[in-house]
Amino acid sequence: MLKNILVGQSGGPTAVINSSLYGVIEEGLRNKEKIGTVYGMVHGIEGFLAGNFINLSEVADNEPIDRLKITPASFLGSCRYMLPEDLGDKVYDKLFDTFAQMNIGYVFYIGGNDSMDTVSKLSRVALLKKSDIRFIGVPKTIDNDLVMTDHTPGYGSTAKYVASTLKEIILDATCYAHPSVTIVELMGRHAGWVTAASVLARTEYSRNPYLIYMPEHAFDMEEFKKSLKAALEQETAVVVCVSEGIADRDGRFICEYADAASVDGFGHKMLTGCGKYLENYVKAEFGIKCRSIELNLPQRCSSLLASATDIDEAEKAGKAAVVAALDGETGKMITFVRDDTNGYEINYGLADVNDICNKEKKFPAEWITADGTDISDEYIKYVRPLIQGTNIAEYSDGVPVHLKPAYYR
């Protein structure tokens, strides 16, 4: 009897995580002589533990499955669930019993750092149980903070969204003749990759965003005041971009200056509010108009500004995962290997998931100016290829068409 595929999505959604899902489904269906049915976890490993899954082979037979590539967020539904550290916990018995009942031979988990932790634990339990199930991680995160890969699916589209949206914000913020400051808060708890993309919004006629602050460089309120004062001497309207996770020299988040931060299911501090805090600070110190803007969810899941390059690479990563599993690989994550020899090109490799999970790739310090307020041209060379091409969306009655999510079925 042919072994079946089980695929899940976990963590924060992106504009292209469903492209990776499409890649897994397509490659699985293409290998009909080796693979039986493709199943999907509904709401990740947490939902699967509750008995929620979907037959994706049937979906592919009856619906335009390629529409996944223009559907944002997580088609299968997501979760933020940590498997127990104790590999002897009964939850693993339940999982592997269910795998056996469903004749699962290959498990693919699409996600970021914590999702790779899930792949690591499952592959280690498989060794203990002498199971031949193969577990492969497919990278996903707008934060671009996974180690051992040039970049991650989702980041290119977020960078494109940030740059495009900032260009429009800048035009709006600078159209008045009176001094003003606009502070844009972007995602990024410990790594500033998302905020760095704001530099792409600059034009030959405007240097805005004039100041860019990221978690990798300690934030100082007095230095911020001096830098903003200097910027206002050069520009009537100044746009400032900040990562949600900017912190002072003592490691205290700027958002905590106003309120204590909440904690999510993984124990990570939920950071919002540094933009609003800085807005009030600027109003008090400078006495000029100031507003703060949180780009919030659209920066991670807007498909209308998705990068065609990102969509294509995400799909290929999903396909590469199936190929790797069929070749006998397990406990690995698909990696992106850049080759700039003859222009931009990405090759797909593999890395041990244990070398990836619970580690974090920070934005390179050498790509941040000494005063911590700007980004170097090296980053621009790095990111430009990732944002190329435009998503071709489908429309009905003037609004985008998406594939109906699994959790609504």
Indicate residue ranges for each PLM-predicted region:
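Gly-rich Lys/Arg/Thr-decorated short loops/hinges at beta-loop-alpha junctions or inter-strand turns
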Residues: 4-7, 68-81, 140-150, 177-180, ...
